[in-house]
A protein has these predicted regions:
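Short, Lys/Arg-enriched charge-dense amphipathic segments
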Residues: 18, 22, 44-55, 187-190
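Internal, charge-rich low-complexity segments
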Residues: 17-45
Length: 202
């Protein structure tokens, strides 16, 4: 992968917020998804239950609400970690240190690390898939950009000596924070192979 700082900048919203949303449209969306996917073995306990287990951040510390990412200089990222209420948990400058060839989804993932002071040490190391689709796709009718990631106080907690993920089924996910409710619903629908809405249900 080619690291491009611009791909990461901006506001990011934790996918977990979609799972607990009380907006009628998102609840309708999940109801339809649950019905459409209930026969699949992976979703036997329920679609939302599956994703809450896969994407959950509570076991690693405070439940995340999202990130705010700005350019710290020409290459590095200043990442502000937000809690579920949108309040800052930590903020530090992260340096791109390389890649993991077989990371989340078996794809190349970017490795970031900060040497800055942190209140929450689990934010020291960040492993993340490049955002997909590109952020610009949204302007042309594409889905919101999203990415899967993992984080820990050190790399040994994320990657074993064999170069494989220590927790291969842990999939915290961030989505472009600029998305409308319709765009958020359509991510959920597309994930489960349902037709995207052209407008919110009434």
């Amino acid at each position: 992968m080619n690291y491009e700082q611009k791909d990461w900048l901006g506001s990011w919203q934790n996918f977990e917020s979609y799972l607990v949303s009380t907006t009628p449209a998102m609840q309708t969306c999940w109801t339809q998804v649950e019905e459409a996917a209930k026969a699949l073995p992976m979703f036997q306990a329920g679609v939302k239950t599956f994703w809450q287990r896969a994407c959950g951040t509570a076991l690693a510390g405070p439940v995340l609400g999202g990130w705010q990412i700005e350019a710290a200089n020409a290459q590095d990222l200043r990442i502000t970690w937000l809690d579920a209420a949108g309040q800052p948990l930590d903020s530090a400058v992260y340096h791109f240190t390389g890649t993991l060839e077989k990371g989340l989804e078996g794809k190349v993932c970017a490795k970031f690390e900060t040497a800055g002071a942190l209140q929450h040490p689990q934010f020291r190391c960040l492993l993340a898939m490049p955002p997909m689709p590109e952020r610009t796709a949204r302007a042309h009718g594409g889905l919101l950009s999203h990415l899967h990631f993992q984080y820990a106080a050190g790399w040994t907690a994320l990657v074993g000596t064999d170069g494989k993920l220590s927790h291969p089924m842990w999939y915290p996910t961030m989505c472009d924070g600029a998305g409308t409710l319709l765009e958020q619903c359509n991510i959920v629908r597309a994930m489960h192979h349902l037709t995207c809405w052209t407008e919110l249900p009434v």
